[in-house]
């Protein structure tokens, strides 16, 4: 006997991302590129370089996952339909008369809708990455987690490499050194879908896809509505770090080291001051002897 919940989640898991959800993903990615300083001028001066940057933003996750699976990073170019669709979005965003696309995108309801639809595609990418990794390495759950994460959030890593080549790279923007909230939540999703695939998580695939997508969309829209980017996994990370590595003890140890470093310097300064204070007394004694 099938229940309405199963029908809903199963129908949701069979939803096609083409074309509407893919359009939303390309639109949000290209608009993020356009909002960079100097991106519009660079598009007019060198359209080919701007187009390549846009393709990296749109297909960065697929490129990185292909490289991890020893496939050609140019494999995404074989999907001509998606390339033409992403190129069309790039063209109308940068070269539309009177900048009508950017003006329309400036309305918050449109931004909420596009951002929510983009998060839906993130779930499909994670699931696709986990499935592709399993086809190459059977039940290799570490590989499945890494490839699923790369497919879902690898675009940020690829665009960081692009910024490095252009000379715009900054250490605080590197996803390897400081992972953003979307990358962390994508990694968490990749772990859950991998465990579900290996039957270590007792939940059906379509139910997990539905629940995880609802969670992503809710968090993203809430962050945009409240304009609060402080939604992080810090409490969970702190708890896990204390359990595994004893972070609190490490902080106490480092603070005690700092105190011990300060003490010799203070003693040294005091001794030097005493020496400087002793010099005038010695000079005064010599001066007194000369007077005698």
Swiss-Prot record:
UniProt: a 1,2-diacyl-sn-glycero-3-phospho-(1D-myo-inositol-4,5-bisphosphate) binding residues: 118, 122
Q: Which InterPro entries match?
A: TRIC_channel
Explain the consequences of disrupting this gene. Mice are neonatal lethal. Mice lacking Tmem38a and Tmem38b show a weak heartbeat at E9.5 followed by loss of cardiomyocyte viability and embryonic lethality around 10.5 dpc.
Q: How is its activity regulated?
A: Channel activity is activated by increased cytosolic Ca(2+) levels and blocked by luminal high Ca(2+) levels.
Q: What reactions does this protein catalyze? A: K(+)(in) = K(+)(out)
> What sections of the protein cross the membrane?
17-34, 48-69, 83-100, 104-122, 141-158, 179-195, 207-225
Record family assignment: Belongs to the TMEM38 family.
Protein name as catalogued: Trimeric intracellular cation channel type B
The organism is Mus musculus (Mouse)
């Amino acid at each position: 006997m099938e229940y309405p919940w199963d029908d809903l989640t199963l129908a949701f898991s069979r939803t096609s991302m083409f074309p509407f959800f893919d359009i939303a993903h390309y639109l949000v990615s290209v608009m993020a590129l356009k909002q960079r300083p100097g991106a519009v001028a660079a598009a007019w001066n060198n359209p080919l370089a701007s187009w390549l940057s846009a393709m990296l933003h749109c297909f960065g996750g697929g490129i990185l996952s292909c490289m991890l699976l020893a496939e050609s990073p140019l494999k995404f170019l074989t999907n001509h339909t998606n390339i033409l669709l992403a190129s069309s979005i790039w063209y109308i965003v940068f070269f539309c008369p009177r900048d009508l696309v950017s003006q329309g995108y400036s309305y918050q309801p449109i931004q909420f809708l596009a951002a929510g639809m983009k998060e839906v595609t993130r779930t499909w990418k994670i699931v696709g990455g986990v499935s592709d990794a399993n086809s190459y390495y059977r039940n290799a759950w570490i590989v499945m987690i890494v490839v699923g994460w790369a497919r879902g959030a690898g675009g940020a890593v690829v665009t960081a490499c692009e910024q490095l080549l252009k000379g715009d790279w900054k250490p605080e923007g590197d996803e390897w050194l400081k992972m953003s909230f979307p990358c962390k939540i994508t990694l968490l999703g990749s772990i859950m879908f991998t465990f579900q695939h290996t039957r270590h998580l007792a939940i059906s695939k379509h139910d997990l896809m539905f629940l995880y997508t609802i969670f992503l969309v809710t968090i993203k829209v809430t962050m945009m509505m409240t304009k609060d980017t402080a939604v992080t996994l810090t409490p969970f990370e702190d708890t896990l770090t204390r359990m595994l590595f004893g972070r609190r003890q490490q902080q106490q140890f480092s603070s005690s080291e700092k105190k011990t470093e300060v003490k010799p310097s203070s003693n040294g300064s005091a001794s030097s001051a005493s020496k400087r204070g002793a010099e005038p007394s010695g000079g005064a004694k010599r001066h007194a002897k000369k007077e005698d």
